[in-house]
């Protein structure tokens, strides 16, 4: 099994690395062709021309675009992501502060989406052929019609502002000083045995995570229901019924194992969109993650931060797809034999 997983990973790397190179070129060139001067955004209007040129040289903007790209890629390979123009900090430090927050948010959202999606999908399958099927279909379509930022606005206004049940901004309460251990606030709170910080962090992440989950869960519901409906018509399911096995046992022990594979693929593919969707949700909830950082960098035309944040999003999407490819083969006996 280990050799199989390593073979899949190696095969994926042969595809992912060229894709990342192409994406990095596109990001870099598009940003450099924008009719803006990032240095002019931060330097004093009264600065002397030689001061402007010195600033441009410090950030490597005085060189030809191909040379800038090669220097950038070379620095990335050595762990140097460059210096932010407007934040007065290294890009590595900025990513280290914000990326863990976004990963936590995306993982919580994925967890909620799977719980809601699988529960709803099994219920939709259970009530098929009844009036309740129509109700659940209409409900899932209505949920799909609302984007994640709309769910975020609804939850903020209803749960946060009107009912005042949960906080609507930040990552934890202002009375806490988060320990700087891993960057993942939940892990750090567990390591330091700080239960109050753990609860505060959970309260702050619930609304943004639910906003992302409620936009994603209906897809899981519908795909799982369709997959189970198709699997239940297979010959081995008919044979199991003839042997007197109960429908519940057939569903849980036979149908669900095969019906979940298309759903798993959907989760992997859509996780990239879910991770990208954190950008707007983070802005709405003032959540200090990668999306929030990227928007602030765009406002300041901070090219080093923008290009590294965009590349990070691409890496996460490709990595999630790779993980799903491995899981799909591990869970599918036919593919394992091939």
Specify the residue positions occupied by each region the protein language model found.
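N-terminal signal-anchor/first transmembrane alpha helix
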Residues: 1-62, 92, 96, 123, ...
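An internal, D/E-rich "acidic patch" concept
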Residues: 1-5, 62-118
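Alpha-helical transmembrane segments of integral membrane proteins
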Residues: 2-7, 99-100, 104-132, 180-338
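Generic hydrophobic transmembrane alpha-helix motif, especially the helices
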Residues: 19, 140-210, 214
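Hydrophobic alpha-helical transmembrane segments of multi-pass integral membrane proteins
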Residues: 21-26, 65, 69, 106-111, ...
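Transmembrane helix-loop junctions in multipass membrane proteins, especially transporters and channels
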Residues: 28, 32-36, 40, 125-130, ...
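Membrane-interface interhelical loops and short interface/amphipathic helices
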Residues: 38-82, 86, 90, 176-189
């Amino acid at each position: 099994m280990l050799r199989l997983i390593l073979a899949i990973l190696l095969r994926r790397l042969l595809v992912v690395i060229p894709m990342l190179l192409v994406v990095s070129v596109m990001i870099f060139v598009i940003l450099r062709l924008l009719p803006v001067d990032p240095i002019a955004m931060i330097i004093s209007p009264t600065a002397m021309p030689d001061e402007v040129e010195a600033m441009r040289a410090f950030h490597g903007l005085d060189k030809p675009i191909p040379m800038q790209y090669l220097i950038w890629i070379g620095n990335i390979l050595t762990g140097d992501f460059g210096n932010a123009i407007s934040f007065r900090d290294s890009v590595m430090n900025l990513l280290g502060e914000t990326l863990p927050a976004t990963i936590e948010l995306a993982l919580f959202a994925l967890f909620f989406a799977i719980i809601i999606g699988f529960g709803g999908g099994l219920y939709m399958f259970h009530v098929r052929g009844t009036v309740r099927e129509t109700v659940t279909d209409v409900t899932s379509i209505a949920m799909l019609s609302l984007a994640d930022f709309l769910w975020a606005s609804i939850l903020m206004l209803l749960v946060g502002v009107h009912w005042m049940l949960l906080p609507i901004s930040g990552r934890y309460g202002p009375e806490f000083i988060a320990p700087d251990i891993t960057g993942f606030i939940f892990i750090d709170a567990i390591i330091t045995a700080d239960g109050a910080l753990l609860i505060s962090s959970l309260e702050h992440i619930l609304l943004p995570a639910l906003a992302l989950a409620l936009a994603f869960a209906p897809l899981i519901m519908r795909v799982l229901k369709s997959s189970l409906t198709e699997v239940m018509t297979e010959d081995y399911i008919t044979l199991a019924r003839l042997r007197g096995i109960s429908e519940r046992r057939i569903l849980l022990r036979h149908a669900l194992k095969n019906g979940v594979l298309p759903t798993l693929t959907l989760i992997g593919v859509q996780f990239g969109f879910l991770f990208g969707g954190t950008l707007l949700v983070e802005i709405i909830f003032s959540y200090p993650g990668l999306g929030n950082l990227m928007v602030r960098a765009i406002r300041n035309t901070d090219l080093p931060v923008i290009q590294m944040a965009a590349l990070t999003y691409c890496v996460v999407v490709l990595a999630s797809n790779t993980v799903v490819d491995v899981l799909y083969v591990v869970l599918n006996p036919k593919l394992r034999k091939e």
